[in-house]
Structure formats: C-alpha cells, structure tokens
From Swiss-Prot:
Protein name listed in UniProt: Large ribosomal subunit protein eL28
Organism: Spodoptera frugiperda
Alphabetical GO biological process terms: translation
PANTHER family, alphabetized: 60S RIBOSOMAL PROTEIN L28
Sequence similarity: Belongs to the eukaryotic ribosomal protein eL28 family.
Origin: domain of life: Eukaryota
Keyword check for Iron: no
GO cellular component, one term: ribosome
Signal sequence, start to end: none
C-alpha cells in the first residue's frame, strides 16, 4: 500500500493519537516521530525513511533509531539503532553526518538534532542554587 493510503486510514484513529480539548491539532506518541505532531510529513509509521531519538536506559547519551528505505517490507530488518555517548557536540555532529549520509530530509534532521540536544540537556546535573544574601542574613 502507498504511504498516502496508509495515512488516510490512520489519520484520525490510531493508538498513538493524543486528543485533548481546546487543542486544534492532535499530538502523536508514535516511535519515530521527532516532532510529536500528527501529520503526514512527520509520521514514523508510514514513511519509508523515518528517524527517532530516544534516551539511553542508563541516562548517558541517546539512541537514534532510523528506518532503512530498502527493507520496507521486512519490519525486523527495517529499524537500525545507533547509540551516541561521546559528548554533546561530538554526538550531535555525528547525528548530523549520519542523516546527511543517508539522505534524510533537512527538516527531519533539524528536528532530530533539536530532540537529541533536549535529551542531552535533561541529562545534565542540576546545579545547586546559592542562597540569596537577604535570606541568608535573616536566618
């Protein structure tokens, strides 16, 4: 089946949709959707080439999951997982090179880099805040 026909089938009704009141466009929780928007362009289920970013279980780095266009009819061989733990700048540079080498769309690669950097930012240790001078004097 074509991706357009698949989209027409799953567009308004699938297990990954998140519909809420006062939100015009529903969100999506599907695995390879980097923007979490329910749209044909970013849908990870129907596109031949899709990319997703997930956090590593040990909270050190992230994993990029991408689909190979050649193995569309073989779901077991379709997904490729690559872990990145080298450090923030180096990992993001490697992801950028990976997506460029596999000829992914630029909007997908930008969204992927944004998601990966958000994951790395969430893994940073939280700095202890110093007490303010006024509060310290009164105690």
């Amino acid at each position: 089946m074509s991706s357009h026909l698949n989209w027409m089938i799953i567009r308004n009704n699938n297990a990954f949709l998140v519909k809420k009141r006062n939100i015009k466009k529903p969100f999506s929780k599907e695995p390879n959707n980097v923007t979490n928007l329910n749209s044909y362009r970013y849908n990870g289920l129907i596109q031949k080439k899709a990319v997703g970013v997930v956090e590593n279980p040990d909270r050190k780095g992230f994993t990029v999951v991408y689909k190979k266009a050649k193995a569309t009819n073989k779901p077991a061989k379709n997904a490729v997982r690559r872990q990145f733990k080298a450090g923030a700048r180096r990992s993001l540079y490697k992801v950028k090179r990976l997506l460029k080498a596999n000829h992914y769309r630029t909007d997908l690669s930008k969204a992927t880099l944004r998601r990966a950097s958000a994951i790395l930012r969430s893994q940073r240790p939280i700095k202890a805040k110093k007490p303010k001078a006024a509060v310290a004097k009164t105690e």
